[in-house]
């Protein structure tokens, strides 16, 4: 499976073929089919395997769930950035296996330890997970474009320069956008910086939500003697 993952990392889902995989393994494509029935099966197996790369943090101590959530989010984000073909593969094949399920179980454990329950727990896990994997979409889009240009033989650097020029031309009609694009051209914000900022905002919001839920629960508790 390591050879398939490495090939996907280089070529993406559309660039994967059994002949190239066989060459990496030192075998004919027909021999590969003895082990996996199809390209879709290879993608499904590779998709499930990469989830194991996410480092599982220790069980959070009472009141200390946030460091676990931060470490788990960072490891998940890094994994998806290493394998930017993952989400296109999931979307194309509806792949859902033990690896992804285990990741979801571990995410629930972190937010259960924080004190979320019921629908609040579901909402916290969903908000956290959607942010992590949405944050990687820029990396995935850039990878898909590079892979497509590589297959077509186009000059990626020249095309990106043209796209940036077009974006700047469009932005001139929008003052706030024009100002921020100019600022970013001098001091660009890295993908990691954007991720760290967004994760802080999400976890700040979830902490505030948890405090609000607890305060509401205290208000609705029956008083002594009732």
Enumerate the predicted regions with their spans.
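Amphipathic alpha-helical segments used for helix-helix packing
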Residues: 47, 77-99, 105-106, 137-145, ...
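C-terminal peripheral helix-coil segments that are non-catalytic and often amphipathic
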Residues: 141-226
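Alpha-helical structural segments
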Residues: 2-6, 10-11, 41-57, 67-75, ...
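A contiguous pocket-lining binding segment that forms or flanks enzyme active sites
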Residues: 106-164
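Hydrophobic alpha-helical connector segments
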Residues: 56-102, 118-128
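Hydrophobic recognition helices of helix-based DNA-binding modules
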Residues: 46, 50, 54, 132-136, ...
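Helix-turn-helix
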Residues: 3, 7-41, 45
């Amino acid at each position: 499976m390591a050879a398939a993952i490495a090939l996907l990392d280089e070529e993406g889902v559309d660039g994967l073929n059994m002949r190239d995989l066989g060459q990496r393994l030192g075998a004919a494509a027909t021999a590969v089919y003895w082990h996996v029935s199809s390209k879709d099966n290879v993608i499904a197996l590779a998709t499930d395997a990469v989830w194991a790369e996410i480092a599982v943090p220790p069980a959070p101590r009472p009141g200390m769930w946030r460091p676990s959530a931060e470490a788990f989010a960072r490891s998940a984000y890094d994994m998806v950035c290493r394998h930017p073909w993952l989400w296109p593969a999931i979307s194309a094949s509806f792949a859902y296996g033990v690896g992804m399920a285990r990741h979801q179980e571990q995410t629930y454990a972190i937010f259960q330890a924080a004190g979320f329950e019921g629908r609040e727990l579901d909402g916290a896990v969903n908000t956290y997970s959607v942010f992590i994997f949405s944050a990687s979409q820029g990396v995935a889009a850039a990878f898909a474009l590079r892979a497509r240009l590589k297959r077509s033989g186009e000059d990626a650097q020249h095309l990106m320069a043209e796209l940036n020029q077009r974006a700047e031309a469009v932005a001139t009609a929008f003052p706030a956008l024009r100002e921020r694009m100019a600022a970013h051209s001098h001091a660009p914000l890295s993908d990691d910086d954007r991720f760290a900022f967004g994760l802080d905002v999400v976890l700040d919001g979830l902490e505030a939500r948890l405090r609000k839920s607890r305060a509401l629960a205290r208000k609705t508790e029956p008083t002594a003697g009732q």
